[in-house]
Amino acid sequence: MWGSRIAVALRILVVLAILPVFLLLVYSLPFVRPVSTLMVKDYALLQGVNRQWVDIENIAPVLVNSVMMAEDGQFCSHGGVDWHQLGLVLDDAGDGGPSRGASTITMQMVKNLFLWNGRSYLRKGLEFPLALIADAVLSRKRIMEIYLNIAEWGPGIYGIEAAARHYFKRSAAKLTARQAALLAVTLPNPALRNPAKPTRNMQRIARIVAGRAMRSGPYVTCVK
């Protein structure tokens, strides 16, 4: 009996391991429009979901640049995991210093596609191999496109097109540099940050991000 249960459990584990790889291959097709686990949950609970897919060509470049500079400035140069940044995080943790994030845009994308929210060493451990696989399967441009279309920008607001229309009454293609920067700095905490009504601290960070986005040319070539 125990032998058969173990065999079934192993089969389930194999399927769970293979499924994300298969889905990433499917998501490499440009006409496929993935959804996040949060969106699936909202659909299952019959909660409202505001998401309008938009191709990356129809997103203002300043928004793409702002998100990259705010979330993952080395997006075009690492392989899905920023090992240098991760090393700095581990050093800080060992020294008892303040915590900092090491999640890349690729890691955030796979988390949104396949995993759950909340702090968890297990989830973080799963992000690493999934991000490496995603980087091998998908182009950087496709990774950015998927991320911008599944990221949460507020309760029930998914994707940059829905966010741009909800907060600024315009399409993602027509966002200004200031609006793009405010949307970018909203991403780490969309439940508490409102880009249409930014706090002074949000405005300060947005100005920094906007400045970096203006000088981001050498860092954003992979999404052009």
From Swiss-Prot:
Location of this chain's protein in the cell: Cell inner membrane
GO cellular component term of the entry, any: peptidoglycan-based cell wall
Catalytic activity: [GlcNAc-(1->4)-Mur2Ac(oyl-L-Ala-gamma-D-Glu-L-Lys-D-Ala-D-Ala)](n)-di-trans,octa-cis-undecaprenyl diphosphate + beta-D-GlcNAc-(1->4)-Mur2Ac(oyl-L-Ala-gamma-D-Glu-L-Lys-D-Ala-D-Ala)-di-trans,octa-cis-undecaprenyl diphosphate = [GlcNAc-(1->4)-Mur2Ac(oyl-L-Ala-gamma-D-Glu-L-Lys-D-Ala-D-Ala)](n+1)-di-trans,octa-cis-undecaprenyl diphosphate + di-trans,octa-cis-undecaprenyl diphosphate + H(+)
GO biological process: cell wall organization; peptidoglycan biosynthetic process; regulation of cell shape
Entry annotated with the keyword Transferase: yes
TM spans (from-to): 12-32
Pathway connected to this protein: Cell wall biogenesis; peptidoglycan biosynthesis
Coiled coil: none
EC number(s) on file: 2.4.99.28
UniProt membrane topology term: Single-pass membrane protein
Highest rank taxon of the organism: Bacteria
Keywords: Cell inner membrane, Cell membrane, Cell shape, Cell wall biogenesis/degradation, Glycosyltransferase, Membrane, Peptidoglycan synthesis, Transferase, Transmembrane, Transmembrane helix
GO MF annotation terms: pentosyltransferase activity; peptidoglycan glycosyltransferase activity
Classification via InterPro entries: Glyco_trans_51 (IPR001264), Lysozyme-like_dom_sf (IPR023346), PBP_transglycosylase (IPR036950), Pep_trsgly (IPR011812)
Function: Peptidoglycan polymerase that catalyzes glycan chain elongation from lipid-linked precursors.
PANTHER family: BIOSYNTHETIC PEPTIDOGLYCAN TRANSGLYCOSYLASE, MONOFUNCTIONAL BIOSYNTHETIC PEPTIDOGLYCAN TRANSGLYCOSYLASE
Family: Belongs to the glycosyltransferase 51 family.
NCBIfam families according to UniProt: mono_pep_trsgly
Protein name: Biosynthetic peptidoglycan transglycosylase
Organism: Brucella melitensis biotype 1 (strain ATCC 23456 / CCUG 17765 / NCTC 10094 / 16M)
Lineage summary: Bacteria, Pseudomonadati, Pseudomonadota, Alphaproteobacteria, Hyphomicrobiales
Gene designation per UniProt: mtgA
